[in-house]
């Protein structure tokens, strides 16, 4: 890195480009693999989760218990879709061509055990096929590249709400929800807005409310036990008073338990037969059985965190003397700080032999584990110990302590609990927390905080699908085993391996989370792989999602991008990871920080923290000034602590952000001067960069942000060296590198079609003799230049109006951009035809097509397939095919005679593949899949032919363009070079934008980019200006002067038509402009004759169906207001759905006779038939006797008349 005498450094971006860097942050953390999250999640799934699931499901015992199948531990074997890593791309190409899946086979070893004889027989079987992740983080399903989007959902755990509004009523409630990953939801609530105290009720799933005292009594806790446990609480007393079952003194504890269990059974299992067994096992099965209730590791972690004592006893006063496990004594009345609270909690967790504390876990009074964990504790004896709680007395305020009020009881759950299902201590601690909230102890939860949300990545989603499939497999296997003799059973004949394959197929083809990959350009692809959605199974619904859920939250900082989200109904529900964001093993989002010790930054100590772990620490921004000794030299700094901002000194800081772009996503980080733009426009800018089409000649921006080179490193459009070595061969199709052990060959992509029809092309950027290191770029893919992302072009822009042509954001461009192919892109269209074969008929490929002009078949070869390289226009035949009309089945004799005399019966019709309207171009590739070549095709298919047509699209009027700052517009006119305003040296402008588009949009970034771009062009250099650490206005002024330009950035511009200067100098500079994937060629559409709807007989709608334009109610008013009755009559009858009359009009036009009057529109008949369906007969009464023509017309239509 070369240091200049100026206040910048020259830094290298990519293998070639150097840029001037003026940023303050000197130690930005290098961007890691931006696609690592999904790849790591998938690897975790195949390495750990499959084994865990198989251990859960097996052994499977036959329904007659004569035999069982056991899984041999750690016997999972995978057959990957490629033998060596370097073959992966070749296999992916094959899967795309043959429309198959890129998947791996899963083999396991099962042991059959016969109960009577004890005979054991091992067998290796195929369990199924699971799609395999590519090295770029996508999946190939039926030949299409797909992405599994991560989901952001509420984490399992306990959540408390104070004065929450209920959906059904206007009342406010206190609420406790215990959410599992799998199992029954528990909701505890009581109304807080009514004049009288309300009883606390519990709801399990969506059943009726149960009084909480009845619920506790079903485990054996009576009124006195409840008062002893939870202390004095008026809401609790009211709940006990309103409960009728519990205070009846003549009943024993066991009888009360039975009564309460019966009452709960009748509510939850309404209508089911009740028995002693069923009522006792109901709650224990629903809440404490690990097979039916699963919190997951995350849920247990969340529950233990929330139900510990720390949160509730911090900032309170002790009402009992405490000796901690460290031997520290805290007297009655001690103010409890966060540190003391943690020490008290740890005293309950400490092992008995080292524990000097007077705090110990105590048993819940009068509880018998056999009643609570009925039947479950037979298999799991450790549950008998899980009736312990941590308990302490405190005063919530100093006033309560001084008044010597009755202390509050605070109960925590068993901190040693690791079970992934609920325990009685969890329920008691949760109810204690709920009651504490009524007296102001504890905190309610923010459902929108990332502390309470977790990421479900691809691995976990596939684990869920595999679990469903294995449960189906278990059931099917058990039934098959029961139906066979023990000695006839083999692992293979009772295991249906189609279940897993089909479950995966269904998920990848139908799930909302499996998306067709957005491949318009490399940024779109990376953005799609880093997307997070709150929708989907178990998530939110876009129609009911409230504003609060969609809003940016303070915990998103450094984890979720606050800018990149769609406009429209999904705003705030579909999000993107921030650049440095990672996911930990529990699914919580983390962001990295540098550790700061006593004002000194340790750049080697990078800590990844979740939003929960950030509590209690102080954080500083990355743009603080640091000296050579890594000491922070600013005296006063803005500090973030507990999600609030305060002013402090360097000594107060615990952590430092790792980069100024830490807050934003990859797409938002690619916007220069992001900090000078309004957030709404930045949102549009980041979304529109994803729509930029790759141009024929890529050009890197003069003003970049530095993220472009990082994107190049991790994009699947590029190829990086796998090993160190020397380049020994380079051409347009492959690169060979000699390494220490072997020769690595890298095959390049040429004219490949992306999912969206844009071109994927790779050009070598290395030469023979170059030495490359592992991870170095070897090629530039589409939209890359010299190892940097290059989505658009640097164009000379003037902000001026011109004869009203740039009204309302329209754009005026120079004809040079068309002539020199500056904004020309290539679009590839795939057209497919199938040849079917059956017993009675078959499609025939031929050049001999009836009733087709020779001109449209001029480029066919002798087989009837288009030649590669042919120029084709709409209507040209691509593949000749004739199909039987299907009226008659020829006899064997007729077939023989036709074959002998080489005759073709006349009942064949032309069903050839023809070029669609607007898809003119050059045939670049033809692909034939046939059974002859050994390709696997569907039943009834003999062959499939795919023709690829490339279309060169120059920029034209109606195309959409945009900058990187949300400044978008449509081209309104293309001016000849000689008519374009030019600078004093004769340089014509490339593009004219309306200056009125800047002030109200508040995206000033484009103005700064324009001035800096002009300086860059004049100085022959390039700049980097990272997000939130960009080049300052004063620096830009200095650079303009250095380039011998006016520091205002304005220049004299001459109107070539008059030769006069414009009245005032205008802002002229270089802006990076993008051509978007909204081209007029895809949108322009007209219809003369086309298809009609079957029922209404009205023309179809939309370009894809060659439909018409809807003439709606308001358009009818327009014609009515002008009195254009004849036109109106035509539009609503002949041209729409009057079938009979439209045929008469055609006849009249052919015969040159008078056009008849219109008749009855078909929609009238539809109405008449719908009324008949409602048993109403619609008839027509004539008043004129001379309307013979009308009578005939009604007779023809079948409408009754009098």
Swiss-Prot record:
Alphabetized InterPro entries for the sequence: DNA-dir_RNA_pol_bsu_ext_1_sf, DNA-dir_RNA_pol_bsu_external_1, DNA-dir_RNA_pol_su2, DNA-dir_RNAP_su2_dom, DNA-dir_RNAP_su2_hyb_sf, RNA_pol_bsu_bac, RNA_pol_bsu_CS, RNA_pol_bsu_protrusion
Enzyme Commission code(s) on record: 2.7.7.6
GO terms under biological process: DNA-templated transcription
One cellular component term from this protein's GO annotations in UniProt: DNA-directed RNA polymerase complex
Claim: Metal-binding is one of the keywords in the record: no
Pfam families: RNA_pol_Rpb2_1, RNA_pol_Rpb2_2, RNA_pol_Rpb2_3, RNA_pol_Rpb2_45, RNA_pol_Rpb2_6, RNA_pol_Rpb2_7
Subunit structure: The RNAP catalytic core consists of 2 alpha, 1 beta, 1 beta' and 1 omega subunit. When a sigma factor is associated with the core the holoenzyme is formed, which can initiate transcription.
Function: DNA-dependent RNA polymerase catalyzes the transcription of DNA into RNA using the four ribonucleoside triphosphates as substrates.
Similarity comment: family membership: Belongs to the RNA polymerase beta chain family.
Name of the molecule in the record: DNA-directed RNA polymerase subunit beta
Species of the source: Mycoplasmopsis synoviae (strain 53)
């Amino acid at each position: 890195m070369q240091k200049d005498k100026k206040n910048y450094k020259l830094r290298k971006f990519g293998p070639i480009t150097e840029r001037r860097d003026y940023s303050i942050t000197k130690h930005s953390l290098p961007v890691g693999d931006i696609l690592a999250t999904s790849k790591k999640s998938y690897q975790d799934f195949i390495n750990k989760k499959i084994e865990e699931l198989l251990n859960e499901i097996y052994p499977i015992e036959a329904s007659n218990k004569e035999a069982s199948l056991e899984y041999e531990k750690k016997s999972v074997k995978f057959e990957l879709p490629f033998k060596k890593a370097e073959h992966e791309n070749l296999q992916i190409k094959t899967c795309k061509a043959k429309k198959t899946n890129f998947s791996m086979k899963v083999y396991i070893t099962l042991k059959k055990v016969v109960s009577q004889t004890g005979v054991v027989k091992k067998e290796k079987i195929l369990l199924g096929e699971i799609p395999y992740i590519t090295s770029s983080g996508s999946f190939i399903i039926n030949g299409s590249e797909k992405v599994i989007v991560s989901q952001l959902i509420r984490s399992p755990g306990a959540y408390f709400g104070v004065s929450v509004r209920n959906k059904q009523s206007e009342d406010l409630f206190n609420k406790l929800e215990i959410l599992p990953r799998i199992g029954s939801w528990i909701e505890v609530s009581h109304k807080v807005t009514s004049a009288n105290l309300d009883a606390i009720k519990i709801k399990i799933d969506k059943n009726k409310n149960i009084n909480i005292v009845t619920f506790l009594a079903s485990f054996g806790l009576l009124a006195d036990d409840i008062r002893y446990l939870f202390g004095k609480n008026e809401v609790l007393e009211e709940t006990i008073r309103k409960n009728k079952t519990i205070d009846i003194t003549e009943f024993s504890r066991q009888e009360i338990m039975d009564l309460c269990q019966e009452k709960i059974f009748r509510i939850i299992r309404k209508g089911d037969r009740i028995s002693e067994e069923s009522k006792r096992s109901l709650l224990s099965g629903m809440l404490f059985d690990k097979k039916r209730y699963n919190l997951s590791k995350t849920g247990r972690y969340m529950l233990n965190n929330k139900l510990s004592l720390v949160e509730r006893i911090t900032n309170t006063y002790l009402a009992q003397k405490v000796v901690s496990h460290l031997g520290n004594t805290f007297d009655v009345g001690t103010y409890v700080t966060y540190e003391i609270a943690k020490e008290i909690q740890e005293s309950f967790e400490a092992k008995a032999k080292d524990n000097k504390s007077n705090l110990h876990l105590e048993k819940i009074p009068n509880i018998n584990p056999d009643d609570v964990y009925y039947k479950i504790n037979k298999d799991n004896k450790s549950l008998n110990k899980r009736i312990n709680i941590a308990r302490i007395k405190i005063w919530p305020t100093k006033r309560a302590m001084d008044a010597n009020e009755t202390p509050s009881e605070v109960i925590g759950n068993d901190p040693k609990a690791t079970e992934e299902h609920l325990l009685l201590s969890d329920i008691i601690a949760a109810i204690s927390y709920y009651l504490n909230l009524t007296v102001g102890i504890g905190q309610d939860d923010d459902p929108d905080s990332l502390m309470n949300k977790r990421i479900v990545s691809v691995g976990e989603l596939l684990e869920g699908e595999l679990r469903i499939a294995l449960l189906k497999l278990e059931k099917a296997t058990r039934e098959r085993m029961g139906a066979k003799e023990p000695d006839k059973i083999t692992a293979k004949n009772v295991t249906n391996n189609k279940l897993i394959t089909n479950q995966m197929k269904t998920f990848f083809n139908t799930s909302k989370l499996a998306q067709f990959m957005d491949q318009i350009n490399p940024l779109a692809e990376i953005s799609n792989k880093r997307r997070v959605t709150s929708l989907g199974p178990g998530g939110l619904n876009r129609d009911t999602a409230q504003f609060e859920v969609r809003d940016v939250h303070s915990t998103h900082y450094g984890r979720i991008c606050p800018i990149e989200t769609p406009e429209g109904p999904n705003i705030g529900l579909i999000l993107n990871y921030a650049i440095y964001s990672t996911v930990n093993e529990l699914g919580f989002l983390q962001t990295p920080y540098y550790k700061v010790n006593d004002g000194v930054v340790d750049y080697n100590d990078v800590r990844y923290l979740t939003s929960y772990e950030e509590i209690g620490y102080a954080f500083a921004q990355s743009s603080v000034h640091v000296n050579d000794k890594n000491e922070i030299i600013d005296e006063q700094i803005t500090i973030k602590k507990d999600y609030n901002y305060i002013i402090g000194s360097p000594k107060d800081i615990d952590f430092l952000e790792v980069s100024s772009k830490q807050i934003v996503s990859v797409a938002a980080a690619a916007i220069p001067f992001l900090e000078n733009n309004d957030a709404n426009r930045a949102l549009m800018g980041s979304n529109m960069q994803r729509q930029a089409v790759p141009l024929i000649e890529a050009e890197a921006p003069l003003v970049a942000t530095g993220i472009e080179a990082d994107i190049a490193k991790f994009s699947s459009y590029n190829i990086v060296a796998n090993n160190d070595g020397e380049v020994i061969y380079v051409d347009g199709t492959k690169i060979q590198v000699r390494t220490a052990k072997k020769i690595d060959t890298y095959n390049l992509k040429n004219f490949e079609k992306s999912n969206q029809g844009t071109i994927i092309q790779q050009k070598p950027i290395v030469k023979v003799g170059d030495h490359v290191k592992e991870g170095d770029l070897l090629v530039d893919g589409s939209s890359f230049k010299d190892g940097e992302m290059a989505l658009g072009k640097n164009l000379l822009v003037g902000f001026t109006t011109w004869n009203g042509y740039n009204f309302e954001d329209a754009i005026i461009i120079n004809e040079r951009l068309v002539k020199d192919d500056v904004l020309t892109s290539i679009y590839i269209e795939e057209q497919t035809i199938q040849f079917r074969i059956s017993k009675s008929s078959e499609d025939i490929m031929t050049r001999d097509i009836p009733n087709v002009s020779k001109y449209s078949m001029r480029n066919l070869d002798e087989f009837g397939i288009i030649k590669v390289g042919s120029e084709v226009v709409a209507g040209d035949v691509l593949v000749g095919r004739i199909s039987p009309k299907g009226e008659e089945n020829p006899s064997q004799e007729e077939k023989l005679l036709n074959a002998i005399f080489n005759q073709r019966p006349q009942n064949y019709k032309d069903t050839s593949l023809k070029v669609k309207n607007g898809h003119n171009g050059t045939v670049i590739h033809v692909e034939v899949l046939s059974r002859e070549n050994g390709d696997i095709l569907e039943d009834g298919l003999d062959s499939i032919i795919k023709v690829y047509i490339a279309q060169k699209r120059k920029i034209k009027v109606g195309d959409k363009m945009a900058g990187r700052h949300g400044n978008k517009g449509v081209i309104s006119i293309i001016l000849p070079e000689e008519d374009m305003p030019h600078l004093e040296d004769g340089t014509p402008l490339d593009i004219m934008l309306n200056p009125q588009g800047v002030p109200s949009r508040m995206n000033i970034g484009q103005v700064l980019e324009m001035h800096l771009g002009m300086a860059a062009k004049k100085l022959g250099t390039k700049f980097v200006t990272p997000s939130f650490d960009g080049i300052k206005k004063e620096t830009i002024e200095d650079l303009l002067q250095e380039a011998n330009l006016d520091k205002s950035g304005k220049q004299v511009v001459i109107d070539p038509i008059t030769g006069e200067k414009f009245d005032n100098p205008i802002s002229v500079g270089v802006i990076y402009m993008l051509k978007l994937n909204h081209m007029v060629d895809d949108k322009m559409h007209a219809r003369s004759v086309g298809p009609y709807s079957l029922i209404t007989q009205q023309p179809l709608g939309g370009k894809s169906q060659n439909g018409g334009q809807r003439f709606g109610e308001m358009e009818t008013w327009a014609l009515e207001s002008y009195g254009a009755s004849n036109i109106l009559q035509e539009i609503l009858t002949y041209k729409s759905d009057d079938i009979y009359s439209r045929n008469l009009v055609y006849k009249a036009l052919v015969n040159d006779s008078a056009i008849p009057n219109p008749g009855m529109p078909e929609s009238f008949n539809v109405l008449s038939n719908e009324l008949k369906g409602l048993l109403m007969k619609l008839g027509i009464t004539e008043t004129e006797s001379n309307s013979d023509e009308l009578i005939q017309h009604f007779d023809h239509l079948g409408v009754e008349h009098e």
